[in-house]
Amino acid sequence: PDRREIMVVNLHFDWVEDDKFRFQQAKELAKYLDTLTLPYVLMGDFNDQPQSRTLDLLSRGTMAAVKPRQDRFTFPSMKPTIEIDFIFAAPREDWQLNFSRVLNGKVTSDHRPFLAVVELQP
């Protein structure tokens, strides 16, 4: 099939109550992402929630791998109460989300794993 190159970017943003540093990290990353000529997948522990300015900035122009509403929380793994792990693909029109879910199994991290199957469109 199609053998197009993509860029995969994994991140783990800082966790502090005040989001100033995290947002600064996001602005620097956004500058880098804007230079890419390849389609990309951005994923990781954003340590921020969906309505944050960090997520607003980094999700612009992307296809978000949306989690099932009833099972979207990823942290803490034993009894998750917040959604801070995300997967985005850009540019939006190049990608299709085929499947997504938060996995609930043997605990190997303080976060539950988030799985998404995204397909690069021809």
Give residue spans per PLM region.
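Surface-exposed cleft-lining segments at the edges of enzyme active sites
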Residues: L11-D19
